[in-house]
Amino acid sequence: MIRTLIALVPADKRGTLGLYTVLTVLSVVIRAAGTVLLVPLVAALFGDTPQDAWPWLGWLTAATAAGWIVDTTTSRLGFDLGFAVLDHTQHDVADRMPNIRLDWLTAENTATARAAIASTGPELVGLVVNLLTPLIGAVLLPAAIAVALVAVSPPLGLAALAGVVVLLGAMWASNRLSRKADTVADETNSAFTERIIEFARTQQALRAARRVEPARSLVGDALGAQHGAGVRLLAMQIPGQLLFSLASQLALILLAGMATWLTVRGELSVPEAVAMIVVVARYLEPFTSLSELTPAIESTRGTLGRIRAVLDAPTLTAGDAAPADTKSAPRIEFDCVTFGYGDHPVLDDVSFVLEPGSTTAIVGPSGSGKSTILSLIAGLHQPTEGRVLIDGVDAASLDDESRRAATSVVFQQPYLFDGSIRDNILVGDPGADEDRLAAAVRLARVDELTARLPNGDASKVGEAGAALSGGERQRVSIARALVKPAPVLLVDEATSALDTENEAAVVDALTADLRHRTRVIVAHRLASIRHADRVLFLDGGRIVEDGTIDGLLAAGGRFDEFWRRQHEAADWQITH
């Protein structure tokens, strides 16, 4: 945990971290000295010359004042470090997210990322002052007191040193017992949170299927897993707590017995023995504090682990290359490209060339790799083997800005942000002037939509575009893609879920765009590709047919069969 925290400290604060560490250790030494000073103070106070206690009281006062000054300075440095870690971590996580490989962002890892981002607030700021400082003190103070006791009473000091080893070992064993169960409990809590969100978002489908009872849904499974993990966690924590409690009691008995034995032998006076009992109590106190800190330590360990998981997530490689021409439609080439999601292969040794300004349709059965090709062109994924070339430049060697500026994408399920229609369109290019914005709105026929709304393009779309229909969301999405001055336009199943009217609007918008672009269209509905110059038919991750629409229809192969089935489905009707 401490290693992870140190790694999160920005480079310009490493000096502050070193000073903080030195002062924290100095604070421990001062507190240990102040504790052991009680022995000569009490001995003098109850001895034959009580006035001899004044110098020892002076030393104790000086140690207390010095400790207060050091602790105040340490707290200030701790807050400084905490805010530095917070700021550095938030920027690191935010900068990392746009470059994380999409195949890493599974449901589980997305929950991890969400929890990491949500917890990088007060918990990180308070980590140093409220947890790290007490943790260092709780671990080092008993050892420092034991070392100081060696100078007063070597047998008692050595016994105290042995007690440090035993108690820290008992605490380590206790934490070891519960750590794995705590990890499982944390994972099930995250999973339960995700299922609750999913349960709320899918109420329409669940009610239609009569699956509204949580017990009959995945929420019930997640709740059961959470309950089981909580029971296992308690089953592990209780034996660990009993083990540490037993070790603490044995240490107290051992040290008190040692002090009594030394007093009986005459090696300690009665006042010294009384003071030793006070010192022993002070010696055991940090272990109790450490035990109380354990839940917070484990929680923080989980938080730092989630942050580390996001920062260590695999990212897309990027270089410093840039295409020679960022405005003209580029030549796109797949050179022996192989790609898979984890162990699941999707594309197998795919090669083709798309000429500048051409419109290419990619069709084929579900799962054949069509959308994956678009993702590779857009730079959302990178090939496992082979290369994707943009005007002869390997896309993996492009800098991030060039890679993102090269393509404009219309997704099958468009996502609209919680803002106005205008705001959502300008996401494509915030610097677009009014003429370019108006042209994109007109081409996508968004003007027909805004004309019906009381606030026009200032109308709010709601979270994820909930205030608009599916076709209306797609029109806004297309306007967003068209307003972006990208030389490559990628369209992924943009009409698959639309009615005939909206499908026609989408197709007209895409074909009416006069910007010189290289276009790649993935479609199941063949009406969407009637203007394509070329068709690639994919099956099983390979290109099995390549040619013009008329040429492939005349060949009577897979595409022809696909085409005929589309027409048969279009002619299908219910008869009485």
UniProtKB/Swiss-Prot annotation:
Subunit structure comment from the entry: Forms a heterodimer with IrtA.
Organism: Mycolicibacterium smegmatis (strain ATCC 700084 / mc(2)155)
Cytoplasmic side: 1-25, 74-131, 174-241, 289-576
Keyword Lyase applies: no
Protein's name according to its UniProt entry: Mycobactin import ATP-binding/permease protein IrtB
Domain ABC transmembrane type-1: 19-299
UniProt free text on domains: In IrtB the ATP-binding domain (NBD) and the transmembrane domain (TMD) are fused.
GO cellular component: plasma membrane
